[in-house]
Structure formats: structure tokens, C-alpha cells
């Protein structure tokens, strides 16, 4: 079973990645690249879901 420290580290990494993808998506919107923005926002939603599941798991484990 993963340790609390491992779960915390993964959560932090996912949060940072999610923030970076969100920034890229916003940049794509600002430059008018709607196709890229749409895909990046989809990735952001998926990462956000993974982050919520990981955090929920860490609180129940």
C-alpha cells in the first residue's frame, strides 16, 4: 500500500500539472486557437478528476 507521503507527492505533482495545463489552455484561448484550447480543457478536467479521486482515496485509506 502506498504511504501517505507518496500519495501527497502524487497529489502535489498532479496539481502542478493541472495548473500548467490550465495556463496553456487559457493561453490557447487568448491566441484564438480554439481547437487546442478545447483539448487542453478536456485534459484539465481529466487531471482534476484524477486529483479529486487521489485526494479522496488518501482521506479514506
Question: Which residues fall in each region the model found?
Answer:
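N-terminal acidic leader/helix
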Residues: 1-27
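Short, charge-rich amphipathic interface segments used for partner binding and complex assembly
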Residues: 26-61
